[in-house]
Amino acid sequence: MAARAPAARTLLCPAFRRTHSHDPADRQSPVPFRRLWPPCPRPRRGLPAATTSRSPSSRPTPQLHIALPTRRAGRHAPDLAALFEAVGVRHVPGVVTTIHADAARWTSPHRRRPVHPALRPLRPGRRSRLFTPPIPGLAEHAFNVDAGGVTTSTGERIRPPPSSGRGAAANPVGAADSPASMTVRARSADPFLAGDRHATASSSTGDVALAARRPRQRCRHVPASTL
């Protein structure tokens, strides 16, 4: 009968073998645990303290904007003009140049002279980012509804004080979760600013917001397939 081959021993860490193995030879291993890891940080001992210290970076935190490939460069971006026309919104062409927080008005060059239509609600879309160039008053109204609660805080900032004679309901701020809910919210908007949710994905230039005024007429429903 052939001799039986010895069982293969599992290669374990000397410290593990010394503390967990049932083999007496392993428990009598002269290699202590404290000698295993000191060689790792040894090259750092000769470096000055200023070299090994860590300090937070002064660079701003990078932001990642993700867009679908079909909507890249604005090729298949939704037509906001057509969307709001279906709910009875008349657009005011032009670029917003100044937002007056106290008077709830905004300035835009239109027909060779600036117009100052009254600004009431601010209507950002869900997961939208508003490009914030150096426009006076825009920093107070910049919004980012990727995180919850930002819309509510924006409403608190632009809501007029009670002494102004206007009720708190005159300046509602809401984020539209879908095109259908956007049409419902837009029924009471007169006028409002709507940020293009694909503006930062396609280009960082152009209009920072879409200024619109709603005439007094009945709104129609817009299906979700519009976007």
Curated annotation (Swiss-Prot):
GO biological process: nitrogen fixation
Composition bias, Low complexity: 48-62
Top-level taxon in the UniProt lineage: Bacteria
Keywords of the record: Nitrogen fixation
Ranges in coiled-coil conformation: none
Lineage of source species: Bacteria, Pseudomonadati, Pseudomonadota, Alphaproteobacteria, Rhodospirillales
The organism of origin for this protein: Azospirillum brasilense
Annotated region described as Disordered, given as residue ranges: 19-63, 107-128, 150-227
Protein name per UniProt: Protein NifY
Recorded family membership: Belongs to the NifX/NifY family.
